Design a protein with these regions (language model features):
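ATP-dependent carboxylate/acyl-activation modules
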Residues: 1-201, 205-319, 329-331, 340, ...
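Catalytic core of bacterial c-di-GMP phosphodiesterases, primarily the EAL and HD-GYP domains
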Residues: 324
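Short amphipathic alpha-helix used as the core "switch/output" element in two-component signaling
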Residues: 336-337
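Short internal beta-strands
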Residues: 345-354
């Protein structure tokens, strides 16, 4: 789960990480009132959407005139921002962050996440703050600093000093070394206590006053840990999430909307990804990732059908199920009952493999439903691509 920048900064402040004074704003009138209260030489008005690249898309405005904040708020609220992370449809702006500006002397990059190679929380740092870290890693990997933290021991002062000296803070500004080490400890606490998946500050600035400030922030949470954090759950902004993904979550389905025209319903994440790959190889594009889990019961399949059919781009549905512990004839019964209940209006191809697959395929073939049955993955992909009007 992602949160907005203003929410991330609120968490930073709770854990002792310095941030600019700022406030969430949802109207021009509120912008005026807050600007008068803030009374700073420079005001920064930032669109709040769950995507990066806001500055390049015109979503970040800077002014020295507090009277201009209302006009900037009016300009941004309701605007659709298109960035490299939103896709062509963009994201509509519903709220802003209005905060004080800062005197920037140096920009750094800092984040903490779980390193997939080690399984340990790991700090990522760079002197190339304010840039896309993926671009830095690609073009100048030598500028990426990593410091892994043994979770059995926790963060230690030497971990912070390792990062500080690797960044060259002793040359850049020695006065911030101790506050920097303390900040890393606070970020580690935030990461661990809140079950975060990513905590990122980009840029972390050293000001001309020789202080550290988190100028921009991002926090993502592990969905599996949300049940432990009611305060984090309250930060969820459903306006920023795909409605079909929200519905899928409510039905305990793993769904990600894509831009293709073939709806996929699969049991197991690995098989789901393989299914999307083979659809592309057959000459079409998947409309989604949908993992119905191990059961593939009538209820889960029916919920999956409803979600897929609500996507106007879906011109056909490909069900690809492997029967392991759950036998294929039981899965077939679930598919048949769900299809009758939902009333499928697009071509449907079902591929069954695994325990009692022949029996399951026979049930489907004898069901009287308008569907195609296959036992081979490539054959099934070619069938659904052909039925949706695209040549393989």
């Amino acid at each position: 789960m992602n949160v907005h920048e203003f929410q991330a900064k609120s968490l930073f402040a709770q854990f002792g990480v310095p941030v600019p004074r700022g406030k969430e704003i949802t109207s021009p009138e509120a912008a005026t009132a807050w600007a008068n209260e803030l009374d700073t030489p420079v005001f920064v008005v930032k669109a709040q959407i769950h995507a990066g690249g806001r500055g390049k898309a015109g979503g970040v405005k800077i002014t020295k005139d507090k009277a201009a904040c209302a006009g900037l708020a009016k300009e941004l609220i309701g605007k659709t921002l298109v960035t490299h992370q939103t896709g062509p449809k963009g994201r509509k702006v519903h709220r802003l962050l209005v905060e004080e500006g800062a005197n920037i002397a140096k920009e750094l990059y800092l984040s903490i996440l779980v390193d997939r190679d080690t399984g340990w929380p790991t700090f990522i740092a760079s002197t190339e703050g304010g840039m896309e870290i993926e671009e830095v890693a690609d073009k100048t990997p030598e500028k990426i600093i990593k410091e892994a933290i043994d979770p059995a021991v926790g963060f230690q002062g030497h971990n912070g000093r390792n990062v500080a000296f690797a960044l060259g803070l002793q040359q850049i500004e020695p006065a911030v070394i101790n506050p920097f080490v303390q900040m890393l400890g606070n970020l580690y606490r935030l990461f661990m206590e809140k079950n975060a998946a990513l905590v990122e500050i980009n840029p972390l600035i050293i000001t001309k006053e020789k202080t550290l400030v988190a100028l921009d922030g991002k926090v993502s949470f592990d969905d599996n840990g949300l049940f432990k954090h009611e305060d984090v759950q309250k930060m969820r902004d459903l306006n920023e999430e795909e409605p079909l993904e929200i519905e899928a979550t409510a039905n305990n389905l793993n769904y990600v909307k894509l831009d293709g025209n073939i709806g996929c319903m699969v049991n197991g994440a690995g098989l789901a990804m393989a299914t999307m790959d083979v659809i592309k190889l057959a000459g079409s594009e998947p409309a989604n990732f949908l993992d119905v889990g191990g059961g593939a019961t009538k209820e889960t399949v029916a919920a999956g059908f409803r979600i897929l059919l609500k996507d106007p781009n879906v011109k056909g549905i490909f069900i690809n199920i492997f029967g392991g512990i759950v036998r294929c004839e039981r899965i077939a019964h679930g598919v048949i009952e769900a299809a009758k209940e939902v009333k499928i209006t697009v071509p449907l191809v079902v591929r069954l493999q695994g325990t009692n697959a022949p029996e399951g395929r026979k049930l489907l073939a004898d069901s009287g439903l308008k569907l195609e049955v296959a036992d081979d993955l490539w054959e099934a992909a070619q069938k659904i691509v052909k039925l949706t009007g695209k040549a393989a």
